[in-house]
Design a protein with these regions (language model features):
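Hydrophobic/aromatic-rich core segments of domains that either
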Residues: 148-216, 227
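Alpha-helical repeat scaffolds
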Residues: 249-257, 287-313
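Amphipathic alpha-helical repeat scaffolds of TPR domains
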Residues: 222-244, 265-286, 316-336
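Active-site neighborhood of thiol-dependent amide/isopeptide-bond enzymes
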Residues: 115-173
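Secondary-structure boundary elements
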Residues: 43-136
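Sec-dependent N-terminal signal peptides
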Residues: 4-13
């Protein structure tokens, strides 16, 4: 056990020593360290910064925080604040949330009369390029999908001090905020940005085939706290690392484990942790000639614990039916936007 923890503690430190030359892996270690400091309270918690760091690491530092991220977000904030005042949305308790939604889905001078719409090119690809889900890309192209659009909304909400949270469905995320203006019969607004709809909870549960247990334990349909949101971004950092280098290793294990300290009901993080342990075990046994010593036994024990914890999330496996429904819903939403909004 001691050898394992020594390895895990030294792993990021050893990489950071190499950071003077900044290899591709070093950008990930740097991003991890900064996110970890946010979660530990050693640095200011910033969802905007956390999202940027994951994208910056993937691009190996070729993404500027000010010019590629902050400047555009600040410009959008200025427009939304003006929109909020001019349209007297302060008369609503959720007026700022309404202003953010309007900016994203409707044509106004502030978005160049080009709303942020679903990126349908991803449907025709056998494998979606990882960067297609980046917020920095959506800010530039006004095209996004079920990750980048709600994450952009969450960043704007945080910057504008509007109460709104990310929530998950299987392989999907959306926005939740309390319906303080009683617009719907439910306590929470479930805002689906890919289809420009407010969806009732029962419909999300049915459409994504979510079981009661997954809702009860907080895996799906549960608003994330800001700390959980940054922890979720840390798990995404590990996924980006795996996508870029095509491997699970000590970094992805450490990244997922740190994320799970703050957001335990993230099935993706448990999957990353399990696959990373599997790789670590295989490599260790290859070095020892498949001798299962105390260290190997402990690694296997960690793997068993990981599987048990994953099972407790009651994750829904995405089916072809779910994928096809999401595709059709997005197509119908795009048709509505083209006919009812863009044609104005």
């Amino acid at each position: 056990m001691r050898r394992l923890w020594l390895y895990l503690l030294l792993f990021p430190l050893q990489l950071s020593v190499k950071a003077q030359s900044m290899t591709a892996e070093d950008y990930y270690v740097s991003a991890f360290n900064e996110m970890s400091d946010m979660l530990a309270g050693r640095d200011t918690l910033s969802i905007k910064r956390a999202v940027y760091l994951a994208e910056w690491a993937f691009y190996e530092g070729k993404l500027d925080y000010k010019t590629d991220f902050c400047d555009e977000i600040d410009r959008i904030k200025t427009f939304i604040l003006s929109f909020y005042e001019v349209n007297k949305l302060q008369t609503y308790k959720t007026g700022m949330q309404m202003a953010i939604s309007s900016y994203i889905v409707s044509p106004y001078s502030g978005n160049g009369y080009t709303p942020y719409t679903y990126d349908f090119e991803t449907f025709s690809m056998d494998k979606e390029p990882w960067e297609r889900q980046f917020v920095s890309r959506t800010l530039k192209t006004h095209k996004g999908q079920c990750r980048s659009l709600p994450w952009m909304y969450k960043i704007l909400a945080s910057e504008l001090n509007a109460e709104a949270s990310l929530a998950h469905a299987p392989r999907h995320c959306y926005i939740m905020y309390k319906d303080e203006d009683k617009i719907t019969p439910e306590e929470w607004i479930n805002l689906e940005l890919t289809t420009n709809q407010m969806q009732p909870a029962w419909w999300i549960k049915q459409d994504f085939e979510i079981c009661d247990s997954a809702v009860q334990v907080g895996t799906y349909m549960t608003p994330l706290t800001d700390i959980e949101t940054v922890a979720c971004q840390m798990a995404d950092l590990a996924l980006g690392y795996k996508e870029k280098f095509n491997r699970y290793d000590g970094f992805t294990y450490y990244c997922a484990s740190r994320s799970l300290e703050f957001y335990r009901m993230n099935p993706n993080a448990w999957i990353i942790r399990g696959k990373s342990l599997e790789r670590i075990i295989q490599d260790y046994l290859a070095r020892t000639g498949n001798i299962v010593d105390d260290y190997a036994a402990y690694l296997i024990h960690l793997m068993d614990e990981t599987k048990l914890s994953f099972d407790k999330t009651y994750m829904t496996e995405e089916t072809e039916g779910i994928r096809e429904r999401r595709k059709q819903q997005a197509i119908e939403a795009q048709k509505y936007i083209n006919e009812k909004i863009l044609s104005r």
